């Protein structure tokens, strides 16, 4: 239960990050959508790994 507030704060920070997609997408921008999804997934994995390094108890329940 001690890890829950940490994950909630991290998820709120990720959700409140400014979006890069400020312009309308064109036909040429469609392949970039998967790139942005991959970047968000990689960022989320890095945050979880960082949290596991600091709060080892979080990783024991995975």
Swiss-Prot record:
The cysteine framework is V (CC-CC). GO terms for molecular function: toxin activity. InterPro entries: T-conotoxin. Expressed by the venom duct. Pfam families: Chi-conotoxin (PF16981). It comes from Conus spurius. Contains 2 disulfide bonds that can be either 'C1-C3, C2-C4' or 'C1-C4, C2-C3', since these disulfide connectivities have been observed for conotoxins with cysteine framework V (for examples, see AC P0DQQ7 and AC P81755). One of its GO terms (cellular component) is extracellular region. This is Conotoxin Sr5.7. Belongs to the conotoxin T superfamily. Residues 23-44 form a propeptide. The lineage of its organism: Eukaryota, Metazoa, Spiralia, Lophotrochozoa, Mollusca. It is found in: Secreted. Residues 1-22 form the signal peptide. Keywords: Cleavage on pair of basic residues, Disulfide bond, Secreted, Signal, Toxin.
């Amino acid at each position: 239960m001690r890890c829950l507030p940490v994950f909630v704060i991290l998820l709120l920070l990720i959700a409140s990050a400014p979006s890069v997609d400020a312009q309308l997408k064109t036909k040429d921008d469609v392949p970039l959508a998967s790139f942005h999804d991959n970047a968000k997934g990689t960022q989320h994995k890095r945050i979880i790994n960082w949290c596991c390094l600091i709060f080892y108890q979080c990783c024991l329940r995975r």
